[in-house]
Amino acid sequence: MSFNHQEIEKKWQGYWEENKTFRTPDETEKPKFYALDMFPYPSGAGLHVGHPEGYTATDILSRMKRMQGYNVLHPMGWDAFGLPAEQYALDTGNSPAEFTEHNINTFRNQIKSLGFSYDWDREVNTTDPNYYKWTQWIFLKLFEKGLAYVDEVPVNWCPALGTVLANEEIIDGKSERGGHPVERRPMRQWMLKITAYGDRLLEDLDELDWPESLKDMQRNWIGRSEGAEVHFNIDGTDEKFTVFTTRPDTLFGASYCVLAPEHALVADITTADQKEAVEAYINSVKMKSDLERTELAKEKTGVFTGAYAVNPVNGEKLPIWIADYVLATYGTGAVMAVPAHDERDYEFASTFNLPMKEVVKGGDITKEAYTGDGAHVNSAFLDGLNKEEAIAKMIEWLEVTSAGNQKVTYRLRDWLFSRQRYWGEPIPVIHWEDGTMTAVKEEELPLVLPKTENIRPSGTGESPLANIDEWVNVVDPETGKKGRRETNTMPQWAGSCWYYLRYIDPNNSEALVDPEKVKQWLPVDIYIGGAEHAVLHLLYARFWHKVLYDIGVVPTKEPFQQLFNQGMILGENNEKMSKSKGNVVNPDDIVASHGADTLRLYEMFMGPLDASIAWSENGLDGARRFLDRVWRLFVQDNGELSEKITDAPNKDLEKAYHQTVKKVTEDYAELRFNTAISQMMVFINDAYKAETLPKEYVEGFVKMIAPVAPHIGEELWSKLGYNETITYASWPTFDESKLVEDEVEIVVQVMGKVRAKLTMSKDASKDEMEKLALEAIQDQIEGKTVRKVIVVPGKLVNVVAN
């Protein structure tokens, strides 16, 4: 008989809720363990089968750690601001707040139906004013430290929609919604100076237990480059511009310069006869995204400004071009071009027939750029030096002559922090009529997002908040000065940058987090989520954490000690699940048909946690069959405990049991859930063959399977006679001495060929081994004379006979 999953799951979920089984106490002598999931965005589509994969992994760890005597913090919450809710509100006229609340309730019910051991008293929601009060407080601290500033930044402006679009909302230069043209235009935006933390974000990666591939992604994103800044005067004017180069040693080989089309100097230096061509080119670039502009494979385009720069090292005049592959937002927005020794410059020079000058020996510049090392030539005081020596000498020359200086730059850009949206945290800043701006006072936080029926875009590029006059317009009560509130809102990243801190102290109205509690719980011991957040979310969260460390709010330099990315669950056809393909599997259906325990077991047994694997109905059925086998082994058809279970020991199962405890304990800790489950299956096979089942082993097994299948775990535990939940029962231990093999397999050879295999005591003497071996191969050596017997204790017997 199989078990009734609907009955059992409802019963134990009710028990856990009523008894607050998973409530995490703050004061405790126990060691701590903080297991964190990347909290979900509560979309209208609800939970899909990909969500529970990571959640089950942290839940297994949390449940094991509780049984091992740890005080476990395992929370859940909602990353609930964001574009889809605003889009829904625009399309339907409903409120994004109501939509979000409805979705959260759906998600919460779905998650509870899967039996995760979350402490729901610590639930957070980024759209709750009591939560975003502290998101705004962190912004004030960034503002005070000079890390939040206003800048003119090119954004994706869609005139037809009257709004700024995120890169993700644009497809082939047109708005995803309505297919309207999109152009780049500068707009006043809030920026966060993440670049000020570039070195620390890079160096501290070394101390983290993260996958190396993920650390490399962050290193590349930060993109630290050492080199020099070089100042170029513009011929015939007082103007100058600066370039950054990692190869100052090739300055003698510079043959032209390129400015970004948006560079502030372009309008001033363009000559009258080039003006028309330059303006036409600038207009054509407005439609392109940064990604399109910098694509390596694309055809090089550009136009000559008519102006010349002066090479500081030799006085040569270099033509100044503009080209879209140089971005105003990257570096200085200007580059010196050395086509003989840089691939991109070589392509551009070849396209526009610009001169090339070899300054490093070793290649053939008639065929391609030479980017390797070699002796310098045509370079005056650098001639004969290698790359490293020449770089050092050129930097020295630049600094002595004030023509430049040593410089470290980052690929990392400052973080564009404002959004022209309604559904986000208001930025707590007021712009006064005299041109000054001040932050909202701390005691006035939270600055609450006003309710409004009209969340249509303002049409001016400002957010819909600009339409709410009574909210936007303010008067200083002391001076009578008039002002306007900042109408931009924060991006969705803001609330997710620090949520792991709020779980530690979710109801504190006086502080972001209590200093004693944060000292107790940080760092997060394990953080599991999707690889799509490998760069931005993790980088932003690390940045905010370091700022909070600098102002004494948190005691650790890093938030997340260990990080793991789960793989993706694909459709049965190995394609990504999506509504359009009709291959999405809804966990609610599986919970109804097979049970939550089966879904949890199946997702952990599919393969390694970090692999992307196709969903399989057969695999799901197999997981259910295994749980049924476990149930039938321990429970009779009448619901009573099996009569095979006794208090007497059973030597036959001893080794298998201790092996299972060892392997499951180690594999759970290392997130190798699929191999832990395999080992439990092996044990169940052995247990079916056994005459009797020692109660100690049955209890140990139930404790091991409970983290994966908690409902069946609780039900079996109560059938074993326990009135208390299994949650805090002590984890089983193993005895190493019981794992040692008493018997070994001996190979028997005749004239070097294997003729038999024997099992015997590992302590058998040479004589005993020889005697047993000769008996086993009697028919092989009949009529032959045994000349010699070679015995290797514990391994083999080789008989020489002819």
UniProtKB/Swiss-Prot annotation:
It comes from Bacillus anthracis. The lineage of its organism: Bacteria, Bacillati, Bacillota, Bacilli, Bacillales. ATP binds at residue 579. It is an enzyme of class 6 (ligase). A motif ('HIGH' region) lies at residues 40-51. The keyword Kinase does not apply. It comes from the Bacteria. Belongs to the class-I aminoacyl-tRNA synthetase family. Keywords: Aminoacyl-tRNA synthetase, ATP-binding, Cytoplasm, Ligase, Nucleotide-binding, Protein biosynthesis. One of its GO terms (molecular function) is aminoacyl-tRNA deacylase activity. This is Leucine--tRNA ligase. It catalyses: tRNA(Leu) + L-leucine + ATP = L-leucyl-tRNA(Leu) + AMP + diphosphate. GO terms for biological process: leucyl-tRNA aminoacylation. It holds the Pfam family Anticodon_1. HAMAP family: Leu_tRNA_synth_B. One of its GO terms (cellular component) is cytosol. Its EC number is 6.1.1.4. The keyword Magnesium does not apply. It is found in: Cytoplasm. A motif ('KMSKS' region) lies at residues 576-580.
